[in-house]
From Swiss-Prot:
The gene is eny2. One of its GO terms (cellular component) is nuclear pore. One of its GO terms (molecular function) is transcription coactivator activity. Belongs to the ENY2 family. Involved in mRNA export coupled transcription activation by association with both the TREX-2 and the SAGA complexes. The transcription regulatory histone acetylation (HAT) complex SAGA is a multiprotein complex that activates transcription by remodeling chromatin and mediating histone acetylation and deubiquitination. Within the SAGA complex, participates in a subcomplex that specifically deubiquitinates histones. The SAGA complex is recruited to specific gene promoters by activators, where it is required for transcription. This is Transcription and mRNA export factor ENY2. It is found in: Nucleus, Nucleoplasm. The lineage of its organism: Eukaryota, Metazoa, Chordata, Craniata, Vertebrata. The keyword Nucleus applies. Keywords: Activator, Chromatin regulator, mRNA transport, Nucleus, Protein transport, Transcription, Transcription regulation, Translocation, Transport. One of its GO terms (biological process) is chromatin organization. It comes from the Eukaryota. Component of the nuclear pore complex (NPC)-associated TREX-2 complex (transcription and export complex 2). Component of the SAGA transcription coactivator-HAT complex. Within the SAGA complex, participates in a subcomplex of SAGA called the DUB module (deubiquitination module). Pfam families: EnY2. The keyword Cytoplasm does not apply.
Length: 96
């Protein structure tokens, strides 16, 4: 395992141990609902299903279709807030 992978694993482990990972996930979930991201993605899913026909769409097809759009629709403000929280966490746990 290279240095980057080791560092990533150590950070992830610390996030899990402290419960910060769950808090970050909950914050992300709330922010995405608040900004309408979830509703936009749900509407896009319905459009894809209606376009292709419910019998011709698998879950894997739907995931492949909506993942890029879902990532692109995340507002910059949400990304920045999460990044700020992660940086603050790393600053507190600089011994990693």
């Amino acid at each position: 395992m290279n240095k980057d992978a080791q560092m990533k694993a150590a950070i992830n482990q610390k996030l899990i141990e402290t419960g910060e990972r769950e808090r970050l996930k909950e914050l992300l979930r709330a922010k995405l609902i608040e900004c309408g991201w979830r509703d936009q993605l749900k509407a896009h899913c319905k459009d894809v299903i209606n376009e292709k026909g419910v019998e011709h769409v698998t879950v894997d097809d739907l995931v492949a279709e909506i993942t890029p759009k879902g990532r692109a629709l995340v507002p910059d403000s949400v990304k920045k807030e999460l990044l700020q929280r992660i940086r603050a966490f790393l600053a507190q746990h600089a011994s990693l």
